[in-house]
Amino acid sequence: MALLPILEFPDPRLRTIAKPVAKVDQRIRTLIDDMFETMYDAPGIGLAATQVNVHEQVLVIDLGEETKEPMVFINPSIEILDQEHYEYEEGCLSVPGFYEQVSRPKHIRVTALDRDGKEFVIEPEGLLAVCVQHEMDHLNGKLFVDYVSNIKRQRIRKKLEKQHRQAAQSVG
């Protein structure tokens, strides 16, 4: 297993639309293992392949007690079951140190493949529903900061760009 570098906002590669996985094979299973290792090291509760510059529809989630075991979603699709929404404070490994309230559908159905290529369907609730939607946004080139005002998004962008410049200067 290997730690993968996580892309950070405003890196334009985060806006890439992920392609469906054609075949769940050893290459994809190795990617999944590397993504879990990277997510745990960060530490985080979810990671999309887009965040590690692999533009295929793969995401991993581990909410500890809430999910009982780590979850893998390959080629996920989502169906919104009703119009009820709730707000949740979200953060992101690609937008480190920033948290904002995001409104998302409360009742959803997700269809995906597991790490063995077997289809499954779930109707997640609570944090799992939020996390699945957040990670699926990454596969579509969208970030949680896209849900906040343009002024807030620009402020976050400027702060992260400043942090990147300072980090580059301290290395050089």
Swiss-Prot record:
GO molecular function, one term: metal ion binding
SUPFAM superfamilies in UniProt: Peptide deformylase
Chain positions recorded as Fe cation binding sites: C92, H134, H138
Pfam short name (any one): Pep_deformylase
Active-site residues (renumbered): E135
Record-listed E.C. numbers: 3.5.1.88
CDD domains registered for this protein in UniProt: Pep_deformylase
Principal EC category: hydrolase
Catalysed transformations (reactions): N-terminal N-formyl-L-methionyl-[peptide] + H2O = N-terminal L-methionyl-[peptide] + formate
GO biological process terms held by the UniProt record: co-translational protein modification; translation
Cofactor(s) this protein cannot do without: Fe(2+)
Transmembrane segments: none
Alphabetical UniProt keywords: Hydrolase, Iron, Metal-binding, Protein biosynthesis
Entry's cofactor comment: Binds 1 Fe(2+) ion.
Similarity field: Belongs to the polypeptide deformylase family.
Function, in words: Removes the formyl group from the N-terminal Met of newly synthesized proteins. Requires at least a dipeptide for an efficient rate of reaction. N-terminal L-methionine is a prerequisite for activity but the enzyme has broad specificity at other positions.
Protein name, UniProt field: Peptide deformylase
